[in-house]
Amino acid sequence: LKRVGLNRDHMSRFPHEFSGGQKQRIGIARALAVEPEFVICDEPISALDVSIQAQVLNMLKELQEEMGLTYLFIAHDLSVVKYISDRVIVMYLGTMVEFADSEELYAHPLHPYTQVLLSSIPVADPRLVREKKRIMVKGEIPSPINPKDCCRFAERCPYATEECRAKLPELREVTPGHFVACHMVK
């Protein structure tokens, strides 16, 4: 309990007496009780206030260093992903479209979907907002049920060709440690 910022008094409380952040800390403590090497964190901060999110993220980083943990961190908040991750996998409709070291992926996104995602990260500085190019996609997200045997992003991609609509691209290493599944990236 101490590792996750709780004390002995918390052991005698009922579930309804805990805040969202405390409940999340309890969940993390339960996961750590078996001394894992690998922890899956599926949206671990999505329902928390921003201040509590920062506390939980910092705690996760400290626990990672202290216990030598490896995380599979699943999240939609790309700023959080950048903060917590060493390597990032971007997926679209259940298919991996890009994989690289965090710094490399954020500095040089290659897949059009990754570019769209990164262009959507909010910028706090109004001067930078005017300079930032936001990439918009058109169309509806296709059904993930029985997907076509082609690029999953082709229907919405501004660069899609007939090859994209006819053939599923393979995940290829285009620079050392940077993999992308896109026919347009050579």
How should each PLM-predicted stretch be described?
Residues D101-K186:
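Charged, flexible cofactor/metal-binding loops and thiol motifs
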Residues S12-F14, K132:
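Interfacial catalytic loop of ABC nucleotide-binding domains
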